[in-house]
Amino acid sequence: MKNNKTALAICLASLLALGTSAAQAVVFDDPKGDDKGPGNYIYPTDSVYKAGSFDITKVAITKNGDQAEFAVDVNSSLEDPWGMGVGFSVQMIFIFIKNAPDGHADGLPGLNVKFAPGHEWNKVVILSPQKKARVVGEAQTKAPKLVADISVPNTTRGNNRTIKGSVPLSELGGDGNVDAWAYQVIMQSNEGFPAAGDLLTRKVNEYEGQHRFGGGNDGDCDPHVMDVLESADAKQSEMLAYTCGPNGESVKPATLKMIKK
């Protein structure tokens, strides 16, 4: 009888552990219709940039064995007008993670954002329709001091309204408890011909163009960001507020905060 009770206890403990592992997921909902950056950004004029394409509606992070799966929903059906072959073309998503003390206060090249004290990021996962080799190569060239903390899925795919990719948990460090980490998600646009220092990101100018967002500044003092996660204590309009000098220099940069459940 004692052996039977011991076996039952072990079985129950195993089931509880499995349940805990399966429960390691976190979901963030984001308001619809806020894909305007700090409030006044405008989509490019080309028809490939459909309304809602850059509007984050939900972000889900799930621990699946030794992998972390990232899924981002947008407010428009995904299309592949540029023939990227992965179910989407125009979006590019940066998922910043805080799972350790300290971290990086500067965003990645081309985003023109910083992170507030105490909200510095430790790792970032990039969901791009570009091949992994292209994204990693650009990161090595344009963000050499940060590349060790950049992860890119082997394959990122889009289906219906969801863009999804997975990376090994070992690349993200921390304790592996994805539901306990803090996150910030930036929606940008896949740019195959980026500016010299930009990490495959599309610029925001004063006036929109065929392949340029409008409503910002022709300098690099404005955040090149269409949407981010927000919470009651971290409003998008406040985080993306910025001030430019007369020559397009940054006086007050957009400063992001991490969001945690």
Predicted regions: what is each one?
Residues M1-I10:
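Bacterial N-terminal signal peptides that target proteins for export
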Residues A9-G19:
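Bacterial N-terminal signal peptides
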Residues G19-A25:
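Sec/Tat signal peptide C-region and signal peptidase I cleavage site
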Residues A25-D29, N99-A116, G173-K261:
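Acidic/polar low-complexity flexible segments
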Residues A25-N40:
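Short N-terminal segments immediately surrounding and downstream of signal-peptide cleavage
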Residues V26-V27, Y43-P129, T255-K260:
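Surface-exposed, glycine/proline- and aromatic-rich loop segments on solvent-exposed faces
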Residues V125, K131-L200:
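Short helix-loop boundary/capping segments
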